[in-house]
């Protein structure tokens, strides 16, 4: 409601002169309901009077699957869950009451999932019953076919976290929200409005239903009501948020003591708040060192006396500040020392680019120490193992190694499951939730939790966290050795999921990893790739190759790079 607040971040802008237009008009209707399964009550929410009206009782034995089936058996449904574990559990529970559909497209899609992901993957079983779930990385071809099947009405119901709901425009008639939490924190009004905006899309329908469902006693009724009734509040820039401001004095204390790890702040703040406060601290130290007047420095000004400012400036001169707010000076110094000592990425050997697994684990453990993952990444790559310190890093190394070698998803999952078989005491985890102390290789549910976790690791750890740290290592390596480019750059390998130059070229041209692997298969390579004057060209027949993902991507790439295609 107040976008002008962000102009305060820009110097010499007169905010009083800003003009804005706000509208509450919407071309579609949304009907919102609150279903309290714990109390057995159903309510309709009136958006105009901002009130709840009781519309009936809910049978005590009713579960989420009963509600979804009763309301949306002939409609398109999206069920939002706040964790990957719940996505899988709720989807399986719901689909268990549905018959298998005799539909060729669903049967074909289910078979491809078994081949490309895993034979025991719940997703394949669910697809045949008109249900799907989304918990992380999926091959492009499968993801697009799931979305198309939903648009076509063959798939009726998708269970997912906020990632898919917010990122895809799907024609849902009903949205079921099973929690007011997004991960480990409560949803705010903006997140809620963005979530409910997924139903009632003018392209597909003129109205949609939103069902907020309270399924656990620990979830507070008032929090659901607040989301329904509260307007989006005026926004503050993050440094001025109450949750952040109350810790600013601790930031000053830590910095005055020369503590860039912000020990006091870390002990007092939540992980999410600490991440933001750490970035503020890095900007603040640079502002003081360079004597810059910025909104960040002004936010600290009332908490800063001459003595504190002097100590901070003394502890953090310009050369001890960082231009990258994701990495502090101490991390950068540690990294430079590591690279100058001769550290390189693990070597690739032989025709198949073999990597010594223990060498890779050792390299990752060195990065863990350099970048202080145990402090800054303690929920993922910095987490200590339950039976040995490096067991979590070893688990990620298994997936990382298969990823950069260009293995398909089924191979990556196969090796992830094999690792768990050999190390059952590493337990069964989905995100930060421990599902079992010991992995049981004969348990289909354990296998599917590992599959879900592996998909999440690829999307959130490999392609985000590890990729980012490898990027910094590669930049530092180039700087120390005065290189523009070097062989064996694992940052590239992670980004493209391969060490194969052809696959990297195709991805640089715009194809996804899976489509690139499809194109480079010997039979397809002969059909679709042609070398002209030393340059690789793509035959236009690829536009009708029969692979939905490849066809979709090829049309987009041809539009942007027509010179890449020939008849």
What are these regions (language model features)?
Residues 2-4, 26-29, 83-87, 139, ...:
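Conserved nucleotide-binding/hydrolysis micro-motifs of P-loop NTPases
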Residues 1-31:
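Post-DEXD/H (motif II) to motif III coupling segment of the RecA-like Helicase ATP-binding lobe
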Residues 22-25, 58-157, 181-190:
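Conserved C-terminal RecA-like helicase domain
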Residues 206-302:
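C-terminal helicase module of SF1/SF2 nucleic-acid helicases/translocases
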Residues 170, 174, 180-230:
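Conserved segment of the helicase C-terminal RecA-like domain
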Residues 48-71, 238-257:
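A conserved mid-domain beta-alpha-beta active-site/ligand-binding segment of alpha/beta enzyme cores
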Residues 32-60, 127-134:
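Glycine-rich phosphate-binding "P-loop"
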Residues 254-292, 310-567:
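C-terminal accessory/interaction regions of large nucleic acid-associated machines
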């Amino acid at each position: 409601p107040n976008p002008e607040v962000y102009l305060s971040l820009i110097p010499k802008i007169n905010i009083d002169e800003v003009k804005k237009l706000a509208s509450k008009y919407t071309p579609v209707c949304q009907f919102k309901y609150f279903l309290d399964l714990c109390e057995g009550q159903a309510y309709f929410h009136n958006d105009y009077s901002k009130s709840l009206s009781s519309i009936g009782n809910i049978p005590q034995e009713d579960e989420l699957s009963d509600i979804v089936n009763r309301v949306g058996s002939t409609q398109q449904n999206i069920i939002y869950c706040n964790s990957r574990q719940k996505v899988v559990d709720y989807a399986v529970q719901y689909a268990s009451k549905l018959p298998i559909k005799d539909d060729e497209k669903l049967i074909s899609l289910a078979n491809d999932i078994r081949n490309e992901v895993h034979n025991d993957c719940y997703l394949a079983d669910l697809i045949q019953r008109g249900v799907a779930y989304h918990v992380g990385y999926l091959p492009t071809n499968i993801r697009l076919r799931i979305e198309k099947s939903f648009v076509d009405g063959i798939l009726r119901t998708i269970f997912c976290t906020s990632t898919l709901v917010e990122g895809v425009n799907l024609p849902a008639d009903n949205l079921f929200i099973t929690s007011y939490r997004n991960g480990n924190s409560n949803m705010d009004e903006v997140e809620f409005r963005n979530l409910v905006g997924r139903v009632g899309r003018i392209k597909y329908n003129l109205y949609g239903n939103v069902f907020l469902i309270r399924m656990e006693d620990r979830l507070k009724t008032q929090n659901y009501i607040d989301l329904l009734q509260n307007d989006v509040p005026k926004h503050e820039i993050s440094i001025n948020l109450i949750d952040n401001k109350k810790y600013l004095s601790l930031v000053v204390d830590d910095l005055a003591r020369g503590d860039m790890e912000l020990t006091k702040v870390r002990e007092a703040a939540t992980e999410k708040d600490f991440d933001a406060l750490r970035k503020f601290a890095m900007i603040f130290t640079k502002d003081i060192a360079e004597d810059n007047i910025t909104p960040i420095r002004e936010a600290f000004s009332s908490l800063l006396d001459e003595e504190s400012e002097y100590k901070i400036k003394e502890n953090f001169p310009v050369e001890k500040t960082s231009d990258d707010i994701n990495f502090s000076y101490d991390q950068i110094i540690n990294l430079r020392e590591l690279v100058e000592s001769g550290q390189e990425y693990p070597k690739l050997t032989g025709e198949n680019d073999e990597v010594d697994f223990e060498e890779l684990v050792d390299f990752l453990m060195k990065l863990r120490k350099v970048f202080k993952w145990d402090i800054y990444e303690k929920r993922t790559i910095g987490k200590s193992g339950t039976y040995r310190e490096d067991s979590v890093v070893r688990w990620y190394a298994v997936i990382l190694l298969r990823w950069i070698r260009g293995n398909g998803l089924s191979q990556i999952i196969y090796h992830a499951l094999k690792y768990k078989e050999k190390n059952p005491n590493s337990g069964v985890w989905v995100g930060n939730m421990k599902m079992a102390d010991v992995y049981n290789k004969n348990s289909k549910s354990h296998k599917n939790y590992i599959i879900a976790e592996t998909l999440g690791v690829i999307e959130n750890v490999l392609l985000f966290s590890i990729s980012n740290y490898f990027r910094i290592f590669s930049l530092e390596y180039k700087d120390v050795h005065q290189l523009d480019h070097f062989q064996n750059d694992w940052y590239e390998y992670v980004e493209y999921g391969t060490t194969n130059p052809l696959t990297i070229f195709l991805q640089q041209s715009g194809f996804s990893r899976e489509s690139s692997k499809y194109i480079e298969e010997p039979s397809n390579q002969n059909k679709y790739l042609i070398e002209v004057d030393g340059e690789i060209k793509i035959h236009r027949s690829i536009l009708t190759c029969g692979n939905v993902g490849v066809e979709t991507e090829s049309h987009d790439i041809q539009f942007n790079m027509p010179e890449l295609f020939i008849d």
